[in-house]
Amino acid sequence: MPPANRILTLSIVEGRYAIAKFPCDAEIPAWAAGATFFSVTRTREELSVVTAEASVPAKLDASRGWRMFKVHGPFSFDETGVVAALANPLARVRVGIFVISTFDTDYLLVQHDEIPVAVETLEHAGHKILQLELLNS
């Protein structure tokens, strides 16, 4: 079992991202899969696509301006507290997050204008942030 005060290493991922919503029966848009990073989730209620903001057509209603942290993994499926170790300090300073989990790790998205506060808060909580040179990209 991991410690309650888990310390994690994260990297800032270059670029800005957007989150688009489609009807649940929509086809996955071809433009989404062209980016280096993209995530698609289909539920009974919707199809959500997260991809590079530049890939999303301007006329499409989407939440734009997200920046991304990659949490250095991998993590086993029975590890607990990874997301909580990041979400809890950010919630205390009212920074909203969007989390994507993969087989090996997690990605944490925050709005571009909140990334300085997110970095400061996560570092204050003891986490290590790499690629700070991308902070203003």
Q: How should these model regions be labeled?
A:
Residues V93-L108, E114, L132-S137:
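A cross-kingdom feature marking solvent-exposed beta-strand/loop segments within repeated
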Residues E46-T51, T105-Q111:
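A generic structural motif
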Residues M1-V93, V117-S137:
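Regulatory modules associated with amino-acid/nitrogen control
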